[in-house]
Amino acid sequence: MGDNNGIVVVSTFDGMSCGQQALERAGIPVKRYLASEIDKYAIQVTMANYPNTEQLGSVVDIVTKSLPFTDVFLGGSPCQSFSFAGKRKGMSTADEQEILTLDHYLELKAEQYEFEGQSYLFWEYMRILTDLRKVNPDIKFLLENVVMGKKWEHILSKAIGVNPIKINSALVSAQNRNRLYWTNIGMEPGGLFGHEQSIIKQPKDKLIFLKDVLEADVDSKYYLSEKAVSRINRSINGDKCFAIESKSLCLTAGYYKQDRDNQYIVHNTMPRSSKTKKGGSGPLSRKDGKTYCLDTGSTNAVEIVAMRGRKAVLTPKRT
């Protein structure tokens, strides 16, 4: 795979180019990295960190015959319609025709159908991967998405040709984030009939908690205003949120030793509920030192730390 100068990577839904970060940390040289992303701020972050990135624009506009011979193909297609927040509707047109195959999607696209949500873009990932496989049958791929209903998980697995691996990012970070990963990396023949199976093991739990990643000295532009603190106090139980005068106090490692000291109250101002037909907002408590999954739908989430004898209010840093 690749040559002495490195591999060629195409990454769809590239975001801030975590794929490049992972390859860099793994010590894998990259000759060319082509990225498909439309968010201007994500692109700015990528180009600041990896100025040699070749930006391709929207995934729907990629002409596969213009792509170079590709060694690795990455993607994390939108998950909203697969998640509870999206009522697990899956992939469909605006008039509720379910899209179960790539051929069907390409027909609908040619006829200029309007699609529901953004999760249908999985089929754009498959369109590109299908063409890249024709040029390089040994191409390595990786697709990430949310844990979804078994129906849609089966459809994605059938299309891509492998079953997913479920990994919770809590094993290697301070955030609970269960995700599915479809990949042909680390596959070996196994079982009675010699079918290829993944040999990728679950990551070792690094025992990283929120207290381990919070910053002690934070720029004043990230402080909560008195108005914001007052609003939060009105929204949740007063005994769980304590206002401070100007900024959050430093959280030392010793705070986790008492019962309430490691209780992070996560106040989400966006509708959130385990029941898809009900919204609602308010404090969601955890006592394991981890955050709830904070994704693009949680940009208004505010994390409150309730500590016996000390008072602090924290907000997540936006980047």
Where are these regions (language model features)?
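Conserved active-site and SAM-binding loop architecture
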Residues: 1-319
